[in-house]
């Protein structure tokens, strides 16, 4: 006689019956429940994530070589970031293997540099090289809990989305926080009144940057007591913060003047050296308005140089994803051979410098130069060659 219990579908792995699980998926000759599926997924994702960022697979020189393919100049910053990232991913691999011996703490990164010099590009290139989830946010959109705006957990939600809600993968990802200098506190002394978008945000960021178990609302928005949340361990998430820090050069120069002269000698009309930012110390960042505890969470500092005309010309034409190569490809799809004279590229670079937009503004300038040609030429099958000269660049920019 057949036992009735034998007729009830059950998981072939854990043995739970259909009425005791949420879902039971049927195969040709077996069943698997939702719990066992989740368990298998976590095991596989952990192995894949560790493989993707295993420190044995790359060296600092490998990282720098990859930077060189996409980023022009900035040699010092490339080396600093290459070493910092290499050590970071050695940390969590080493901590897993030697959990009872020495625990290595992570070193988050601060990138200082003017607008359009490549701060965001560094972070994006790193994430692409490491093949890990990446999220980018603007520090000015974050406010303290209880106030209008995003709270710090929303940063982690974006990282979780980038990882397709794979928690294990997200916990090995990279977060880039832009405009970090905009959340400096309003005065040197600790604030007595509430500063919801300055010192308060720095305080809120401290825990997740150091390492904590954060409760993240999967749908975004402010948390409320009855809301479902996802737990994320931020211990191995690499945080990279970037900002222009306008005025920091004067703070450094004044400190050096005090140390040299023995008394306070405020700089009046004396021009500050463009390389002085590379001499930044934690105390200068505190003077700027970053709280000491926050500065302490960013022990690695990379300073980017302001891009010169030659740098911008190189950015236009040399990297793998250079704009000139992109437009040559686009015109080539219409069987048009596009080229630029050297003077044309120099004129584009000078325009970016004049507008103070750096490399970030190059695409907008190139679009304004090529827009009419991209509109007219696809309809004109007789044109096979287009050479952009200095005169064309000047004329097209004058018309926009």
UniProtKB/Swiss-Prot annotation:
Detail which positions bind Zn(2+): 11, 14, 33, 36
* InterPro entries per record: AAA+_ATPase, ATP-dep_Clp_protease_ClpX, ATPase_AAA_core, Clp_ATPase_C, Clp_protease_ATP-bd_su_ClpX, ClpX_bact, P-loop_NTPase, Znf_CppX_C4
Q: Which UniProt keywords apply?
A: ATP-binding, Chaperone, Metal-binding, Nucleotide-binding, Zinc
For this record, the Gene Ontology CC terms, alphabetical, are:
HslUV protease complex
Tell me the superkingdom of the source.
Answer: Bacteria
Binding-site list for ATP: 114-121
The record's section on PANTHER family has: ATP-DEPENDENT CLP PROTEASE ATP-BINDING SUBUNIT CLPX-LIKE, MITOCHONDRIAL, ATP-DEPENDENT CLP PROTEASE ATP-BINDING SUBUNIT CLPX-LIKE, MITOCHONDRIAL-RELATED
Q: Which family does it belong to?
A: Belongs to the ClpX chaperone family.
Q: How does it assemble?
A: Component of the ClpX-ClpP complex. Forms a hexameric ring that, in the presence of ATP, binds to fourteen ClpP subunits assembled into a disk-like structure with a central cavity, resembling the structure of eukaryotic proteasomes.
The UniProt entry, under NCBIfam families, shows: clpX (TIGR00382), PRK05342.1 (NF003745)
Q: What does this protein do?
A: ATP-dependent specificity component of the Clp protease. It directs the protease to specific substrates. Can perform chaperone functions in the absence of ClpP.
This chain's protein is named ATP-dependent Clp protease ATP-binding subunit ClpX
What is the scientific name of the source organism? Neorickettsia sennetsu (strain ATCC VR-367 / Miyayama)
